[in-house]
Design a protein with these regions (language model features):
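Alpha-helical transmembrane segments and their immediate juxtamembrane cytosolic regions
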Residues: 1-180
């Protein structure tokens, strides 16, 4: 993802054709691979961490620490509230699946699916309101990877379809299939 930010802030603004265009395209492709992997590891972390609260706090703290460099790279300002970094997207995704997981044991399966979709919709609106990176797509991908945790092929296909606008993200989803 760092490669993508370097591309967007240093290479892309200075493009004048030639070899730099190819380098920019390569960096963009490499950057698109990162997000599906981040989303996948949020779900993996949710299931495997000993302390979910600490995990969430680490995402938020790292998001706060990295916001100024992110804003400098993406908008050349110290703070841009209209565009927030991916760590906040991942934190919202974690909060979403945590709420849904807690409710899983408290209601019937059909009601749980309805409620979980409602929670996802609300969290998608929150993501758009907070202007986090990957906005509502982040919430949907984390949710799909969580709900279809034991069906990796289906989760990867639906995850990719939910973010198909990022064409090269399929490479990241391919790496997910190779995990374990």
């Amino acid at each position: 993802m760092l490669i993508d930010h370097v591309n967007k802030s240093l290479i892309y603004p200075n493009l004048n054709g030639g070899i730099m265009l190819y380098i920019s395209n390569l960096f963009d492709i490499l950057g698109r691979i990162a997000f599906p992997l981040f989303a996948f590891f949020v779900v993996e972390g949710y299931f495997k961490t000993k302390n979910r609260t600490k995990y969430l706090l680490n995402l938020i703290i790292f998001g706060i620490i990295s916001e100024v460099p992110f804003d400098m790279f993406t908008s050349a300002t110290f703070f841009n509230p209209r565009f927030n970094n991916v760590m906040f997207s991942l934190a919202l995704g974690l909060i979403t699946i945590w709420i849904i997981d807690v409710l899983k044991t408290k209601m019937s399966r059909i009601l749980w699916y309805f409620i979980s979709l409602t929670i996802v919709a609300v969290m998608c609106l929150v993501a758009m309101f907070l202007a986090v990176d990957y906005d509502y797509h982040a919430i949907i991908i984390v949710y799909l990877l969580y709900v279809l945790y034991n069906k990796p092929v289906l989760s990867v296909i639906l995850g990719y379809l939910s973010i198909i606008k990022e064409l090269w993200a399929f490479l990241g989803f391919g790496f997910i299939l190779m995990y374990n």
